[in-house]
Amino acid sequence: MRLGMFMMPVHPPDRMFWSTLAEDSEKSVLADQLGFDELWLGEHFSATTEPIPSPMMFFAGILPRTRNIAFGTAVINLPNHHPAIVAAEAAQFDHMSKGRFMLGVGPGGLVSDFELFNNPDVQARNRMVVEAVDFIQRIWAQDPPYDLQGEFWQVRLKDGIIPALGVGFMPKPYQTPGPPISISLASPNSSSARTAALKGWGMISANIIPTYSVASHWEVYCKACGEAGISPNGENWRVARNVLVAPSDSEAHDRVFGEQGSNRYFYTYMREVLSRVGLLAILKPRPDMPDEQTTVDAITRECVTYGSPKTVLDKLIAFRERVGPFGTLLMTGLDWGGPNAAWERESMHLLAREVMPRFRQHVLAHAAE
C-alpha cells in the first residue's frame, strides 16, 4: 500500500498565480520529506480556479528540491495535444527525473477546455486517448521513418532524416519501454476501466466521486480482465480521496465542515461547476439522490475521509473492503488559505506517520490470509 498526493489543484480564482504555484511547490516538497511515494498533478488550460496548464513544467521546477517522490500527470488530456509533442516532452522529463515519472492520461474533464480545443464529443475524446497512447508508444519503441495514420492524427517523418546527425530522431524515455501509463476514471462504470484492463494501463479513480462509483471501477476492470483471460491486479490502481486527519474526531469535523475549511470551498466549487454543465450526477452519494438533496454537506460526508488517526484508519480499511484492493491511496491537496496550511500540514504528518504504517500492516496481513 503506497501513499501519494494528488492536486487538481483547486484555488480561489482571485489568488495570485505565483502565490498558488509557490504554495503547491511547498506542499509537494513536504510530501517528499514525509515519505509520500508519488505526486500527481492535474492539467487545465482555461480555469484560474484550476490553474496548472503544464504539470510537467511544474514538476521540473520542484525536481531539484525533492529526493525520492515519483511524479505523475493526472492527467495529460490527450485530445488537447498532438501525440508527438507528448511523446517528446514525456521522454525528456523521464530523463530529467531519471525514471521518477508516470504518464497519466485522460479525455479531459473541464468543459471550457472542451470548447477551447473544439473537442465536444465525449466518445470521440475517448477514442482520441487510445489512438494518442498508441502513437506515443510507437514513437518510443522505434526510430524513423514514421508513417502513423489514425482517425484523428498523423505522424509522418520520412524525408527529413539525417541519421549521422541525429536529425529526425525522437527522444526515447529513460525507462524501458517507457513511463508506466494510467488513465483517469470519474464516472460510474467508466468504460476507461475496461480500456485499462485491455491495454495493461493503471487506473486513477477521482477524488470527487462517491464510494459506489469507485467500487464500480474495480467491477468493470475485473469483468474486462475475465473476458480477456487476464488476472486482475489492484497493485496499479490508485484511488484519490480527500483526507483530513486531526488529533481528535471533533477537531477533524470542525475543520472539514467549517466555513473556513478548504474542503468546504472545494466541494462548493465542484458542486456549482458540475451543476452548471449538467454533471451533478458524478457527485451524488446515491445514483437516485434528488438534486436538491445533493448538498455540499451531503457530498462532503460521502467523499471526505476525516477524523483522528484511529478513525481515519478504520474508515480507510472499511473503504478498501467496500471498493476493492487498490494499491495506492492518493491524498488530495487543497488550498492553504487561512488556517488550512497548518491543518493540512498536520494532516499530512499524521497520515504519513501514524495512519499509513497501520494501514499497510492491515493490507499485508489481509493479503497473507
Task: Pin down the residues of each PLM region.
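N-terminal beta1-alpha1-beta2 module of alpha/beta enzyme domains
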Residues: 1-71, 177-179, 368-369
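Hydrophobic faces of well-ordered beta-strands that scaffold small-molecule active sites
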Residues: 3-7, 39-41, 71-74, 101-105, ...
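Internal, glycine-rich beta/alpha segment that forms the wall or movable "lid"
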Residues: 82-199, 215-219, 227-228
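Acidic (Asp/Glu)-rich catalytic clusters
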Residues: 32, 59-68, 90, 94-101, ...
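Conserved, mostly hydrophobic/aromatic
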Residues: 3, 35, 43, 62, ...
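Active-site mouth loops of central-metabolism enzymes
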Residues: 7-22, 76-84, 177-188, 246, ...
